Amino acid sequence: AIKVKDYSARTNEIIGTMPLGVKVGEVFTNYGQGSVRVTGNTYDLSLDGSGFFKMRVTDTSGNDHIRYTRAGNFTITRDGYITDADGNHLQSEAGDLIVPTDAEIVIDRDGAVYANGELIDQIVVTDFEDYNYLKKFADTMYEPVEGATEIESTGALLQGCLEQSNVNVVKEMTQMIAITRAYEANQKVVQTMDSTLDQAVNSVGRV
């Protein structure tokens, strides 16, 4: 993901000592491992560890592009192609992964694909040396930019499972409560200062 930092010029004008507000200084993607949910669906795939599935994406002009994702909720088409919900094709060593529609499909931890016990292909799982060279594409995909270095993935592939969000709900809720309390405390300080100034103004008026 591309980190976005605040490079806007600072103003030389100072009004009092209170900050005039806040804004986002940096945005980044958390690539940490999410929890795994067992679905039992043959074409639901999850990566245990680092790495990405390789996808062939066709744009509206009919041009093909390679993108990468950790979203493994795949399905099989009537022709046997393995695709995501948008019709993008999962890539194997042979290109688009295609399997017999009437066979029992087993995919092992290394990405080897078996049809009725016979090895037919190998799913491509890759990784990158520095995720700062990945640009977000759509909701769940990434595109490497100039300078990206592709490396071998150390993650294992889990069939019949899906990776869930890596957001820690309890932690985020705790942080939100802490922020709310800090806001309330600051609000009370402002109210106290306002009351003090009001009393001072009224006292001066009586003098």
Describe the residue ranges of each PLM region:
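Amphipathic alpha-helical polymerization modules
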Residues: 1-207
